[in-house]
Regions:
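Structural detector for internal amphipathic alpha-helices that build alpha-solenoid repeat scaffolds
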Residues: 18-36, 54-68, 74-80, 87-100, ...
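Short, mixed-charge aromatic SLiMs
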Residues: 86-87, 150-155, 186-189
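Amphipathic alpha-helical scaffolding segments comprising HEAT/armadillo-like alpha-solenoid repeats
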Residues: 1-11, 35-49, 68-80, 100-114, ...
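Eukaryotic acidic, Ser/Thr-rich intrinsically disordered low-complexity regions
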Residues: 176-211
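N-terminal "cap/leader" segments of large eukaryotic alpha-helical scaffolds
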Residues: 1-29
Length: 211
């Protein structure tokens, strides 16, 4: 009889229920799998790639969490044609498995808007959510600073990701916290607009990087 964690893994990766899909993969249960159940989970996930069971990048995410070496080549092949959210999740999975050197650039590129690449707010939101996995590199920080300027879901998420990266720097952490709370403070006499706070944060963080 399968364990509770295996059942939770299977449901979160393969169920078509809207609630389950919305909640995403059960990371805790996946990370608890071991022995034969871990091998079986990996087999099912690899088998599902490219089939109708492969929905919302869930098998890709789970294979990354399992650090599946068997998934490396299939995921690299997937990356050649993947777009948007699936491209981000595939690059992140490869980074989790083997510190794939191109992953950071691939995800940062998903934030860029060009003549041939219109804004995909959900993809932008996911990109800024996962960039802290790559650490406080100059490329990551600059990309998050650019994204923070936007007053939308991606911009707010970028602010939160920067706060995660600079959690040990009190002045930066507090200023980013002000940006996140900004709409709630509009009634205060000393209210400072979001663009002003963002500019202050960008200047402070860039000075920090120059040290």
């Amino acid at each position: 009889m399968p364990s509770y964690d295996f059942e939770q893994f299977y449901e979160s990766c393969f169920s078509r229920s809207f609630e389950i899909v919305h909640d995403g993969v059960n990371e805790k249960s996946i990370l608890k799998l071991h022995g034969d159940e871990r091998k079986e989970a990996e087999r099912l996930l690899l088998q599902s790639l490219g089939t109708d069971k492969d929905s919302y990048s869930r098998p890709v995410i789970a294979l990354g969490l399992l650090r599946s070496k068997e998934a490396v080549e299939p995921l690299k092949q997937r990356l050649e044609t993947a777009t948007g959210i699936d491209r981000i999740q595939t690059a992140l999975a490869l980074f989790r498995i083997e510190k794939y050197p191109e992953a950071e650039k691939i995800i940062i590129d998903c934030l860029k808007i060009t003549n041939t690449n219109s804004a995909d707010e959900m993809a932008q939101w996911l990109a800024v959510e996962v960039l802290p996995h790559f650490g406080k590199t100059n490329q990551v920080v600059e990309s998050l600073l650019d994204a923070m300027i936007q007053d939308n879901m991606a911009g707010r998420s970028a602010t939160n990701s920067l706060r995660t990266l600079f959690i040990d720097d009190e002045p930066i952490r507090n200023l980013l916290g002000q940006i996140l709370l900004n709409p709630h403070d509009a009634h205060k006499p000393d209210f400072v607009s979001r663009p002003e706070l963002v500019n202050q944060a960008i200047e402070l963080i860039r000075k920090h990087l120059e040290k």
